[in-house]
């Protein structure tokens, strides 16, 4: 824009009307296009008392002092001028009317400079005015853009050209305004401190796309080839818009992740990476990376990019999904239940993607769910069979984890059918196997003796627990006659169960009773057969008379063993025998039956030949009854 600082013309005229002193007025600066002309308006004044007959004047170039011999632009007295101004300068004003307006034609760059006027009234009445005008020779129109152009807000851009040549008048037009929507153009002529300016106003609403747009103005002079163009680039301010950002990102745990955020704005934005309200990185830039080294599941989540400047802000988010194997499952729920209750067990874990969850027991799948982080196991009316160890397994394509847990079902005692009594000679052992939770108490009752023995009496009862099974063994000795009835009773806080224990191997007792008589008969028959064979064959004259003497043969005691797996080897203790006999001898029981016999094995030796004596093939057994 051209700024002129000289006083307005009307102020000079007022001052001149008062008269009485030397003075001049002209614009301090004036401009014109190269090749055109310019009219420099000028008025001067002098004291009224001088009253000259003729007034002359001189225009100098770049110096007001004649002593310096400055180039003469115009001289009214002699018409002698500097060669640079030959045919280019003439006076438009009437010096007698104190008008010193100068016209310069066919302007060229070397004519740009300071122009001074000197009044010549004759004699010593000559005066060079200090006021001067600076001529600027231009080649382009002046485009004025507001200091701040904001997108979306209407703006006015002006094109100004000097209009100080009375012979050539400029015509203005806009260039490159087609991409500015629907602009409007206004034109006017404006006086600016004695000079004239042709002005064209362009109104439009800029967009962010108009930033950097090259807008031009053209000044053309009709009937000539003179055209002058000027251009200006639009600096459109607009708020940020995020134009580049990652879409959802999937990364495996431990890998490197780089998130990019790019924004378009003017001026450049402040970019900020944030997560959960915490600033992770920020910088004034058009794009900003956020690098995450060895990502963990804790870094999984939503990341936000915020772009802002003085004209607004924008933000966008990106989801980072960290893929990882399931964590060790956690189990919440009932671990102890009473038989018949409903048990609810919740198994949960965390993984990405969600895992396949499975609950199984002893390789049998009880419940499973696909792509869920929780699995609920419902066991209605639990039974003792539900007691035991369970596993919750979580797996996805990145790994597998498992957790074991135990369910303890509490129930009343159950005496198993394998419970029984067994007798061997004078020893009776009773086995009572109880399934129970919690551990029960076990007692053996002998109704015929009116005696009850429990596991605290370790001389008679041995107990051992394995899991839910409790095995109790009652050992009775000195039972030569029929063994007594034995009832096993087990109880805990949930109930009581009793069972009369059946006897196994009862035929052994029968053989123990008839054994002495049968043995005598068997030996008698054996002797008869031997004698018959001896007399028949007459091969050998052998006289044998078998003799059975109690003193010749030691007692051989037959005591078959009855053992239960895990039972202690304490049955031969003398103290035990004494205690057991005292227990069984209560209430006037009959005395013990001591049966001693030796066993005869008729088939021990192989047959030699048909002449071998039967006595040589058989062993004998002595049976003694007391």
Swiss-Prot record:
Covalently attached lipid (S-palmitoyl cysteine), positions: 531
Record InterPro entries: CD80_C2-set, Ig-like_dom, Ig-like_dom_sf, Ig-like_fold, Ig_sub, Ig_sub2, SIGLEC
Gene Ontology cellular-component terms listed: compact myelin; membrane raft; mesaxon; myelin sheath; myelin sheath adaxonal region; paranode region of axon; plasma membrane; Schmidt-Lanterman incisure
Residue ranges constituting the Ig-like V-type domain according to the UniProt record: 22-120
Sites where the protein binds a ganglioside GT1b (d18:1(4E)): 65-67, 118, 124-128
GO biological process: axon regeneration; cell adhesion; cell-cell adhesion via plasma-membrane adhesion molecules; cellular response to mechanical stimulus; central nervous system myelin formation; central nervous system myelination; myelination; negative regulation of axon extension
Recorded GO MF terms: carbohydrate binding; ganglioside GT1b binding; protein homodimerization activity; protein kinase binding; sialic acid binding; signaling receptor binding
Location of Phosphoserine modifications: 545, 547, 549
Region Required for normal axon myelination in the central nervous system, residue ranges: 577-626
Tissue: Detected in myelin. Detected in olfactory bulb and throughout the brain (at protein level). Detected in brain.
Transmembrane domains' residue ranges: 517-536
Topology with respect to the bilayer: Single-pass type I membrane protein
Residue ranges, annotated region (Disordered): 581-608
Disulfide bonds: 37-165, 42-100, 159-217, 261-305, 347-392, 421-430, 432-488
Positions in the Extracellular compartment: 20-516
Glycosylated sites: 99, 223, 246, 315, 332, 406, 450, 454
Annotated localization: Cell membrane; Membrane raft
Stretches assigned to the Cytoplasmic side: 537-626
Limits of the Ig-like C2-type domain: 139-237, 241-325, 327-412, 413-508
UniProt similarity note: Belongs to the immunoglobulin superfamily. SIGLEC (sialic acid binding Ig-like lectin) family.
Annotated PANTHER family: MYELIN-ASSOCIATED GLYCOPROTEIN, SIALIC ACID BINDING IMMUNOGLOBULIN-LIKE LECTIN
Domain note: The C-terminal cytoplasmic region found only in isoform L-MAG is required for normal myelination in the central nervous system (CNS), but is apparently not required for normal myelination in the peripheral nervous system (PNS). The extracellular domain is required to protect against axon degeneration. The first three Ig-like domains mediate interaction with RTN4R and RTN4RL2, but are not sufficient to inhibit neurite outgrowth. The two C-terminal extracellular Ig-like C2-type domains are required for inhibition of axon longitudinal growth. Besides, the two C-terminal extracellular Ig-like C2-type domains are required for protection against apoptosis after nerve injury.
Subunit-level organization: Monomer and homodimer. Interacts (via the first three N-terminal Ig-like domains) with RTN4R and RTN4RL2. Interacts with isoform 2 of BSG.
The name this protein goes by in its record: Myelin-associated glycoprotein
Organism: Rattus norvegicus
Organism classification: Eukaryota, Metazoa, Chordata, Craniata, Vertebrata
Gene designation: Mag
């Amino acid at each position: 824009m051209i700024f002129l600082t000289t006083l307005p013309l009307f102020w000079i005229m007022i001052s001149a009307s008062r008269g009485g002193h030397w003075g001049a007025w002209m614009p301090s600066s004036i401009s014109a296009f190269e090749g055109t002309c310019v009219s420099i308006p000028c008025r001067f004044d002098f004291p009224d008392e001088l009253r000259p007959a003729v007034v002359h004047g001189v225009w100098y170039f770049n110096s007001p002092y004649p002593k310096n011999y400055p180039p003469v632009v115009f001289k009214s007295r002699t018409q002698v001028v500097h060669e640079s101004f030959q045919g280019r300068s003439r006076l438009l004003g009437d010096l007698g009317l104190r008008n010193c307006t100068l016209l310069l034609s066919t302007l060229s760059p070397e004519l740009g400079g300071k122009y001074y006027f000197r009044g010549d009234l004759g004699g010593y009445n000559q005066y060079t005015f200090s006021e001067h005008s600076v001529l600027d020779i231009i080649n382009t129109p002046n485009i004025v853009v507001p200091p701040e152009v904001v997108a979306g807000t209407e703006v006015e851009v002006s094109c100004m050209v000097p209009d100080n040549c009375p012979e050539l008048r400029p015509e203005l037009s806009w260039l490159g305004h087609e991409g500015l929507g629907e602009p409007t153009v206004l034109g006017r002529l404006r006086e600016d401190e004695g000079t004239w300016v042709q002005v064209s106003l362009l109104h439009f609403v800029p967009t962010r796309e108009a930033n950097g747009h090259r807008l031009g103005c053209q000044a053309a002079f009709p009937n000539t080839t003179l055209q002058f163009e000027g251009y200006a680039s639009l600096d459109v301010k607009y708020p940020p818009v995020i134009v580049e950002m990652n879409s959802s990102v999937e990364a495996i745990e431990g890998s490197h992740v780089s998130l990019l955020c790019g924004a378009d704005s003017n001026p450049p934005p402040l970019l900020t990476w944030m997560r959960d309200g915490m600033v992770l990185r920020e910088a004034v830039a058009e794009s900003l990376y956020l690098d995450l080294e060895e990502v963990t599941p804790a870094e999984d989540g939503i990341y936000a990019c915020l772009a802002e400047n003085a004209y607004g802000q924008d933000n966008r988010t990106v989801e980072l999904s960290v893929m990882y194997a399931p964590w060790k499952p956690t189990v919440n729920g009932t671990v102890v239940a009473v038989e018949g209750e409903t048990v609810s067990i919740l198994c949960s874990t965390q993984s990405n993607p969600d895992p396949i969850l499975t609950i199984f027991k002893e390789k049998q799948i009880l419940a499973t769910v696909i792509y869920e982080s929780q699995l609920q196991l419902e066991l209605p009316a639990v039974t003792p069979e539900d007691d035991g160890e369970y596993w919750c397994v979580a797996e996805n394509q990145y790994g597998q984890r498992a957790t074991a847990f135990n369910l303890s079902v509490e129930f009343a005692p159950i005496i198993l059918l394998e419970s029984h009594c067994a007798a061997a000679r004078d020893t009776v052992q009773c086995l009572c196997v109880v399934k129970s939770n919690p551990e029960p108490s076990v007692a053996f009752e002998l109704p015929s003796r009116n005696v009850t023995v429990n596991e605290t009496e370790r001389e008679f009862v041995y107990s051992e627990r394995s899991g839910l099974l409790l095995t109790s063994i009652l050992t009775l000795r000195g039972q030569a006659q029929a063994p007594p009835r034995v009832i096993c009773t087990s109880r805990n806080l949930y109930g009581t169960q009793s069972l009369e224990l059946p006897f196994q191997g009862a035929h052994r007792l029968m053989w123990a009773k008839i054994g002495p008589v049968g043995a005598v008969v068997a030996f008698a028959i054996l002797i008869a057969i031997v004698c018959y064979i001896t007399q028949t064959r007459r091969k050998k004259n052998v006289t044998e008379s078998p003799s059975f003497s109690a003193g010749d043969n030691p007692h051989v005691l037959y005591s078959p063993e009855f053992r239960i797996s895990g039972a202690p080897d304490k049955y031969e203790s003398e103290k035990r025998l004494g205690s057991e006999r005292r227990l069984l001898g209560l209430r006037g029981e009959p005395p013990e039956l001591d049966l001693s016999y030796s066993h005869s094995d008729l088939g021990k030796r192989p047959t030699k030949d048909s002449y071998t004596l039967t006595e040589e093939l058989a062993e004998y057994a002595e049976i003694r009854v007391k």
